[in-house]
């Protein structure tokens, strides 16, 4: 399971012209689910995302996690993160989980984040989404479990 996390001043996701998720300061989490992923990996990745210290403290050092910084999450499914790009000129998505299982684990990940007390907005699984964001930094990390 992969999370590409971006520290943002704000972010939103729109489906068919309607805003379905919107946050102020926090993290945009692009989430990719692989074939061998499971609930344990979702829990571990949730813990890493929430615990990752990438927000500035009083000395502007990256010492605070998203919850300590008072931020929120916007979680958006993105199957292209699991693409194999090693060969050729077209990505292969053979490592990705089947859609039904990917959706289940995506929802499970979101639920785990919410259970830990952080405001969590979402996109819409498998929809054609428009994601808008204002990067803060920019600060972007690839987390994989």
UniProtKB/Swiss-Prot annotation:
An aminoacyl-tRNA editing enzyme that deacylates mischarged D-aminoacyl-tRNAs. Also deacylates mischarged glycyl-tRNA(Ala), protecting cells against glycine mischarging by AlaRS. Acts via tRNA-based rather than protein-based catalysis; rejects L-amino acids rather than detecting D-amino acids in the active site. By recycling D-aminoacyl-tRNA to D-amino acids and free tRNA molecules, this enzyme counteracts the toxicity associated with the formation of D-aminoacyl-tRNA entities in vivo and helps enforce protein L-homochirality. A Gly-cisPro motif from one monomer fits into the active site of the other monomer to allow specific chiral rejection of L-amino acids. GO terms for molecular function: D-tyrosyl-tRNA(Tyr) deacylase activity; Gly-tRNA(Ala) deacylase activity; Ser(Gly)-tRNA(Ala) hydrolase activity; tRNA binding. It is an enzyme of class 3 (hydrolase). Its EC number is 3.1.1.96. It comes from the Bacteria. Its main location: cytoplasm. One of its GO terms (cellular component) is cytoplasm. Belongs to the DTD family. PANTHER family: D-AMINOACYL-TRNA DEACYLASE 1 (PTHR10472:SF5), D-TYROSYL-TRNA TYR DEACYLASE (PTHR10472). Homodimer. This is D-aminoacyl-tRNA deacylase. It is found in: Cytoplasm. A motif (Gly-cisPro motif, important for rejection of L-amino acids) lies at residues 137-138. The keyword tRNA-binding applies. SUPFAM superfamilies: DTD-like. InterPro entries: Daa-tRNA_deacyls_DTD (IPR003732), DTD-like_sf (IPR023509). GO terms for biological process: D-amino acid catabolic process. Keywords: Cytoplasm, Hydrolase, RNA-binding, tRNA-binding. It comes from Serratia proteamaculans (strain 568). It catalyses: glycyl-tRNA(Ala) + H2O = tRNA(Ala) + glycine + H(+); a D-aminoacyl-tRNA + H2O = a tRNA + a D-alpha-amino acid + H(+).
